[in-house]
């Protein structure tokens, strides 16, 4: 049986087989997996907010924001042998967990997180091979670097793989 490496909120980590990597509690947050299928290494970030400019402090958790988490994850993957040109991405989350009377853009955190992750991945030239984003239900995801499958358990909808 393989060991599961857990990634908390505003957290990230990397794995090699036989380990898998999992995060839970993806509501408006986005879970992003970057993997090198040649080296069989993978990393996951649990991103809470789209832009580090939203942070109020000089010192902040880089794993919390789309614009900084993906750079940090990339450097951790390269440190264990991943090649940037071989990296691919899968992502899930970005739900709209609550309905609001106004159409205030600030309340669309899930959609803004998804857009920020996609923008950053484009900047890094990392293709997104699969995604399961949006909706209004929370998700738990687990990635296996050996099979390259992302298992997604969505509240009230069951499980699927991408």
UniProtKB/Swiss-Prot annotation:
GO terms for biological process: chemotaxis. Keywords: Chemotaxis, Hydrolase. It comes from the Bacteria. It catalyses: L-glutaminyl-[protein] + H2O = L-glutamyl-[protein] + NH4(+). Its EC number is 3.5.1.44. GO terms for molecular function: protein-glutamine glutaminase activity. Belongs to the CheD family. Forms a complex with CheC. Deamidates glutamine residues to glutamate on methyl-accepting chemotaxis receptors (MCPs). CheD-mediated MCP deamidation is required for productive communication of the conformational signals of the chemoreceptors to the CheA kinase. This is Chemoreceptor glutamine deamidase CheD. It comes from Halalkalibacterium halodurans (strain ATCC BAA-125 / DSM 18197 / FERM 7344 / JCM 9153 / C-125).
